[in-house]
Amino acid sequence: MGQKVHPKGLRLGIIRDWDSRWYAGKEYKTLLHEDLKIREFIKKRLYQAGIASVEIERAANRIKVIVNTAKPGIVIGRGGAEVEALRKDLERLTGKQVNLNIAEIKKPELNAQLVAENVAAQLEKRIAFRRAMKQAVGRAMRLGAQGIKIACGGRLAGAEIARTEWYSEGKVPLHTLRADIDYGFAEANTTYGKIGVKVWIYKGEVLPERARVREGGSK
């Protein structure tokens, strides 16, 4: 069932870590909604900054937020003014002390979420969906991806009947748990309705972080 399940969720605790790292008892529901609010607020405010993911860690009444972005300059601003304003707004939103860190994504062409958002943005600008998919696949493969698969679903090119079209190159082993597969989803709001964009990027195998026993029993 590797094709049906979310590729990141399937690999949690094996080669991937959670985006929200905290434990709560009775307050779990409240904190979960707070996480969703934080992510939605950052995504809306920094839409042009290429935000791939937002990681959240909690300790007592403090929140550590790590923003993974392709354009850290936009997030930080001149002299750090933008990031400081964002931190204060997050503190007002949550009522807690917020520590904000910015992490740069060196190769945005290999980040599935950013690729999906880029293809969706091109579809909104009326660029042909096949061309947008082909360009994204080509860029990812040139930068070292071992495989990539893109799916666009909806009223493609204004067709009366919705359909899904795929474009792929290389291999994407969805069943292999040690396979480092990144997954992203975005929606394009066109005049004909929404078009969903899904992206899978395979970057190679990740071996577990433990002492590997060689043949013959020696470590």
From Swiss-Prot:
InterPro entries: KH_dom, KH_dom-like_a/b, KH_dom_type_2, KH_sf_prok-type, Ribosomal_S3_C_sf, Ribosomal_uS3_bac-typ, Ribosomal_uS3_C, Ribosomal_uS3_CS. The keyword RNA-binding applies. SMART domains: KH (SM00322). GO terms for biological process: translation. GO terms for molecular function: mRNA binding; rRNA binding; structural constituent of ribosome. Keywords: Ribonucleoprotein, Ribosomal protein, RNA-binding, rRNA-binding. Belongs to the universal ribosomal protein uS3 family. This is Small ribosomal subunit protein uS3. The gene is rpsC.
